[in-house]
């Protein structure tokens, strides 16, 4: 079963669900929102789709063909690499980039923009 991400609008908690449908997840007293990813056919892809380069066991991820801004009110919050065995997420503090060392075979990379939502590229 593929990864499903759920988001709390109040506290910004993100939950990864790999089995089940997650339909009963709640946080801060309300149901969590299922995060649906955009793709390369959606407007804004050039600043939001992850660009991935693999070097050995490392994945170098840059968000956007044109680098995404990192402003207080508009930024990439995190990058997530999904693997066949789970995944790894890294917060983006100063730059919309990450060097990740995933355990297992990477199958997709996600980036979350606080203004434009979740973006995904399959590997």
Where are these regions (language model features)?
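Residues immediately within or flanking Cys/His clusters that coordinate Zn2+
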Residues: 5, 24, 110
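Cysteine-rich micro-motifs
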Residues: 21-32
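Exposed aromatic-hydrophobic patches
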Residues: 62-63, 97-104
């Amino acid at each position: 079963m593929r990864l499903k991400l759920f988001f709390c609008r109040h506290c910004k908690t993100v939950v990864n669900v790999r089995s089940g449908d997650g339909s009963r997840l709640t946080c801060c007293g309300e149901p969590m929102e299922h995060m649906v990813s955009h793709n390369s056919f959606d407007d804004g892809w050039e600043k939001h789709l992850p660009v991935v380069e693999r070097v050995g066991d490392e994945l170098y991820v840059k968000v956007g063909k044109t680098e995404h801004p990192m402003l207080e009110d508009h930024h990439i919050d995190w990058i997530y690499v999904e693997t066949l065995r789970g995944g790894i997420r890294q917060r983006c503090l100063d730059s919309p980039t990450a060097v990740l060392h995933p355990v297992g075979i990477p199958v997709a990379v996600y980036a979350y923009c606080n203004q434009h939502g979740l973006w995904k590229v399959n590997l």
